[in-house]
């Protein structure tokens, strides 16, 4: 009887701590990531006005979109390690303020070369944010909650696109003070990141032992549980930072994510232009609203698959299935006669497939690595795979400019998504007891 009462009390403490952590941290992190994706991807809509003003070709736009990821490469591993060994609060605040200022300054570019420079610097400024947050979540969420936490955080990606399209459509119609609407778009969307960066210094705690909103028993439970998980992983295999970067599973995940990013960012950056050309629509506000639909599907898929992945404790098929769905949808577009209705259906499925996999994938590294090794692996995977974010948009632009059609680009995306799925499916199983990869 006494043991039953103690078990019930322990369960209540665990449930209370898990709920309190989720409600305290995830809404603010979600807001930061919405700002991140608004600033990263607003060029997808800005180009509808920039092309005429700056004389951009498809190839130049593809390069400008993708060069962000060249700047993004260098600082991701240091960013993840600084969160592990220094301070998430300070690093994320610095990152937000810097990228917000650079987004605002992008409104003053006048040549393609200046646009390349602005996008490169923006990528460098944003580099530490995502891997830093992934490592930060592992300091607060136990393993069985981690994919759900990542899913809720990363739901900001489709939300950023869902909001970004209509907002951009409205702002692009402005012509205040003799400035084109695309310049106002960069001006307006950089300011929230700066303000949120300042707020981060006062809102975001670094570690559980720093907060007063957890009771003592909740804090003790969380600290012990996270320590047990780290010991369980370390007991199976002790991996140093340098060993982690050469770990076969890390390398497979890296190459798999490279192909995912190549296909995904190709679609994300080019989708508004594809909609405009393939439908013949000229109303930018209409394109903005319709362009949000694929990402609504992605948001729903992300939340459902993140929940399912934790429930059945499986990651690899939850990564592959949505991407194979997107590949099949694009194949159907290439094989069937075209209509606007079919295009919107295909784009909705591609939006689902290129977003829904995210939480399952980012729950994988912490399943077989711990502490600084996991932090380094997250940074290494994301920074190396991000090269795909350069190649994807650039290849689509080059193929479109040469052929006058997006069909070659669609075929390229199909190949990338299939290769990514196969590579992650052949990864070894995870090492956390009771979890299937």
Language model features: what each stretch is:
Residues 150-169, 192-193, 382-392:
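Glycine-rich segments within core transmembrane alpha-helices of 12-TM secondary carriers
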Residues 118-155:
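Cytoplasmic helix-loop-helix junction between adjacent transmembrane helices
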Residues 43-44, 242-303, 358, 362, ...:
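Extracytoplasmic gate region of multi-pass secondary transporters
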Residues 315-364:
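C-terminal transmembrane helical hairpin of 12-TM major facilitator-type secondary transporters
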Residues 55, 87, 108-114, 125, ...:
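Helix-breaking motifs and short loop linkers at transmembrane-helix boundaries and internal kinks
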Residues 84-96, 310-323:
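Cytoplasmic membrane-interface "Motif A"-like loop-to-helix N-cap segments
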């Amino acid at each position: 009887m006494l043991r039953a009462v103690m078990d019930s009390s322990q369960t209540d403490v665990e449930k209370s701590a898990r709920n309190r952590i989720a409600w305290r941290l995830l809404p603010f992190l979600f807001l930061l990531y919405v700002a991140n994706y608004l600033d990263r991807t607003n060029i997808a809509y800005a180009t509808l006005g920039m092309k005429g003003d700056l004389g951009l070709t498809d190839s130049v736009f593809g390069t400008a979109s993708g060069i962000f990821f060249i700047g993004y490469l260098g600082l991701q591993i240091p960013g993840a390690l600084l969160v592990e060994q220094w301070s998430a609060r300070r690093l994320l605040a610095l990152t937000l303020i810097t990228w917000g200022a650079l987004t605002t300054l992008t409104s003053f570019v006048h040549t393609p070369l200046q646009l390349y420079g602005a996008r490169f610097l923006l990528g460098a400024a944003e580099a530490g944010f995502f891997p830093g947050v992934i490592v930060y979540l592992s300091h607060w969420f136990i393993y069985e909650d981690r994919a759900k936490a990542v899913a809720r955080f990363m739901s900001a990606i489709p939300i950023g696109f869902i909001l970004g399209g209509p907002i951009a459509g409205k702002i692009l119609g402005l012509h205040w003070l003799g400035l084109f609407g695309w310049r106002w778009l960069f001006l307006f969307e950089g300011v929230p990141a700066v303000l949120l960066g300042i707020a981060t210094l006062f809102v975001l705690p670094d570690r559980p032992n720093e907060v007063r909103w957890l009771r003592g028993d909740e804090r003790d439970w969380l600290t012990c549980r996270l320590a047990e998980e780290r010991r369980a992983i370390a007991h199976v295999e002790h991996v140093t930072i340098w060993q982690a970067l050469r770990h076969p599973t890390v390398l497979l995940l890296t190459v798999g994510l490279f192909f995912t990013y190549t296909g995904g960012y190709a679609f994300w950056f080019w989708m508004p232009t594809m909609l405009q050309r393939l439908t013949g629509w000229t109303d930018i506000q209409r394109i903005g609203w319709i362009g949000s639909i694929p990402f609504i599907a992605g948001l729903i898929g992300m939340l459902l698959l993140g929940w399912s992945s934790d429930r059945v404790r499986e990651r690899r098929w939850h990564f592959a299935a949505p991407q194979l769905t997107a590949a099949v949808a694009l194949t159907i577009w290439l094989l069937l006669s075209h209509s606007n209705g079919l295009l919107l259906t295909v784009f909705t499925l591609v939006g689902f497939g290129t977003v829904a996999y995210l939480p399952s994938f980012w729950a994988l590294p912490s399943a077989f690595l711990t502490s600084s090794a996991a932090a380094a692996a997250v940074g290494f995977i994301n920074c190396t795979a991000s090269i795909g974010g350069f190649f994807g948009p650039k290849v689509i632009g080059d193929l479109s400019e040469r052929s006058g059609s997006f069909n070659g680009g669609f075929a390229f995306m199909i190949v990338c998504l299939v290769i990514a799925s196969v590579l992650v499916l052949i990864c070894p199983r995870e090492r956390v007891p009771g979890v299937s990869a």
